[in-house]
């Protein structure tokens, strides 16, 4: 959660207090404190974005959307609020709106890796596979060490039957993050699919060692 650069109205102590409550998972207490601050500072977009994030964590997605919309109405170039709108719309199954808002966030911060990553996830959700691949590749162009993007690309290529490309992406994810249990599991399943059964058990064992409760480890 980013904090406002212009702190002329809110004190740093006030900002730190609500951010700490949010970071500690004390969402309702954070909401109560933010509402009290809103009475004195009614047009601070940071507060609306943060209360929206709290609502989202509490499962109150419609309330979250309202707060994020208020934040961008006050501050039309508020990157994080647009990104939060996109993610929340996706969570609600409103994929066209999710894409629209995530693209708006990227227009503000073109090289923000998290926005591109969430856009890629959204495209995959609506089976826009080529656009998902393009967005994931943008993620790794911006941050070549983003292991989850390589793993997700591996999943896309595996699902489309391009198993050897999938293996290359899973192996890259593991190279970046040797403790990436899900990538080991995915790699094992792909080796099994292409009949390299001698390699698959090694990957499954690594996955189990790293994350014993990993679901569907033998996929």
How should these model regions be labeled?
Residues 1-13:
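TPR-adjacent "capping" and linker segments in tetratricopeptide-repeat scaffold/adaptor proteins
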Residues 19, 46-57, 80-91, 114-125, ...:
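Conserved alpha-helical positions within TPR/SEL1-like repeat arrays
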Residues 12-40, 53, 57:
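Alpha-helical segment of the N-proximal tetratricopeptide repeat
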Residues 13-16, 141, 175:
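Terminal low-complexity/charged segments
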Residues 23-32, 57-70, 91-104, 114, ...:
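Structural signature of tandem alpha-helical TPR/SEL1-like repeats
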